[in-house]
C-alpha cells in the first residue's frame, strides 16, 4: 500500500464510525495495520485507551501492563517532556516502549512518540514501536494524522461528560426546587437517616420524630422519583428501600443545608 491507500484506510474506518464514537482499539488496529508497528494510545494519566500488537513482545511486565491497561506512572510523566513527534528512539532511551530489562533481545527496537494535543492542552500520547525497520516520513504522516483523530475524539468525549454533568445538575436543581418547605425538610431528614446513597427507612418513624405527616414524605419521594433522581420501593412492614440514581443529588442537598 502507498501513502494514499493507507490514508484512505484510516478514512474508511472513520466513515464507518460515522455518528458514533471512534473506538480507540479500532483506531490502534488500523494504524497497526497501515504502519506495521505496535501501537499504544495512552491517556495523559497513563491509561491504555487502545492498543494493537504487530510484533509480540515476550515479557511478563509488558503482558501485565497490557492486561491492567495502565502504563507506569514515571514513564507516563516523562512523556510530557516530548512536545513534538520524536521518531526512531533506540532501546537505550528512557522513552523506549521495549522492556529495558531485555535490551539484549530488543537491540533493534525503535520507538516513535507522537503527542496527542487538542484544545490547547496535552491529551495523551501515541506510541509506536517495532523491530529492525526505521519509521519513515510516510509512517510519521500517518501517525500524526492518527494522533489528530484521537485528540478530536478525546475532546468530544470530554465535552459530552461536561454536558452530561451539567444536565444531571440541572435535573437535581429542578427536582429540589419543586419541593415545598416541609417536603424539603422531610428529604433532608430522610437522607441524614440513610447516611449514604441507598438504604431502608421507615417513613412513619421519621414523620413522628420530625413532626410532619407521612403523606409529606411520600409526596417528596414521589417528586424525586418522577424526576429520575431516586428510586424507591415499598417493602411493606420493613419500610421503604431508597436508592439515589443521580450522583449530583446529595451534593446539591448538602449545599442547601449549609446555606
UniProtKB/Swiss-Prot annotation:
Region annotation GAF domain: where it falls in the sequence? 1-155
Output one GO MF annotation: GTP binding
Looking at the UniProt feature table, which residue ranges are given for the DNA-binding region? 203-222
One Gene Ontology BP term is: negative regulation of DNA-templated transcription
| Keywords, comma-separated and alphabetical | Cytoplasm, DNA-binding, Phosphoprotein, Repressor, Transcription, Transcription regulation
Gene3D superfamilies (UniProt xref): 3.30.450.40, Winged helix-like DNA-binding domain superfamily/Winged helix DNA-binding domain (1.10.10.10)
Which positions does the record annotate as the modified residue Phosphoserine?
A: 215
GO cellular component terms, semicolon-separated: cytoplasm
Looking at the keywords, is Phosphoprotein present?
Answer: yes
Q: Where in the cell is it found?
A: Cytoplasm
Role according to the record? DNA-binding global transcriptional regulator which is involved in the adaptive response to starvation and acts by directly or indirectly controlling the expression of numerous genes in response to nutrient availability. During rapid exponential growth, CodY is highly active and represses genes whose products allow adaptation to nutrient depletion.
State the family named in the UniProt similarity comment for this chain: Belongs to the CodY family.
Q: What name is this protein filed under?
A: Global transcriptional regulator CodY
Q: In which organism is this protein found?
A: Geobacillus thermodenitrificans (strain NG80-2)
Amino acid at each position: 500500500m502507498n501513502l494514499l491507500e493507507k490514508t484512505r484506510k484510516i478514512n474508511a474506518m472513520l466513515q464507518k464510525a460515522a455518528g458514533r464514537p471512534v473506538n480507540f482499539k479500532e483506531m490502534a488496529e488500523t494504524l497497526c495495520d497501515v504502519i506495521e508497528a505496535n501501537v499504544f494510545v495512552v491517556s495523559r494519566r497513563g491509561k491504555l485507551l487502545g492498543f494493537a500488537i504487530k510484533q509480540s513482545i515476550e515479557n511478563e511486565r509488558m503482558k501485565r501492563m497490557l492486561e491492567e491497561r495502565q502504563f507506569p506512572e514515571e514513564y507516563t510523566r516523562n512523556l510530557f517532556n516530548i512536545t513534538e513527534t520524536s521518531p526512531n528512539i533506540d532501546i537505550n532511551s528512557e522513552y523506549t516502549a521495549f522492556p529495558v530489562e531485555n535490551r539484549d533481545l530488543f537491540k533493534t527496537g525503535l520507538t516513535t512518540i507522537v503527542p496527542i494535543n487538542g484544545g490547547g492542552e496535552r491529551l495523551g500520547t501515541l506510541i509506536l514501536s517495532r523491530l529492525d525497520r526505521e519509521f519513515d516520513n510516510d509512517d510519521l504522516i500517518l501517525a500524526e494524522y492518527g494522533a489528530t483523530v484521537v485528540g478530536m475524539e478525546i475532546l468530544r468525549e470530554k465535552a459530552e461528560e461536561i454536558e452530561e454533568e451539567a444536565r444531571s445538575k440541572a435535573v437535581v436543581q429542578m427536582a429540589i426546587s419543586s419541593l415545598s418547605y416541609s417536603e424539603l425538610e422531610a428529604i433532608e431528614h430522610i437522607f441524614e437517616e440513610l447516611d449514604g446513597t441507598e438504604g431502608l427507612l421507615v417513613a412513619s418513624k421519621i414523620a413522628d420524630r420530625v413532626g410532619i405527616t407521612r403523606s409529606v414524605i411520600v409526596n417528596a419521594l414521589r417528586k424525586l422519583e418522577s424526576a429520575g433522581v431516586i428510586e424507591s420501593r415499598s417493602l411493606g412492614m420493613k419500610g421503604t428501600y431508597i436508592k439515589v440514581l443521580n450522583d449530583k443529588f446529595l451534593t446539591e442537598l448538602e449545599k442547601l443545608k449549609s446555606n
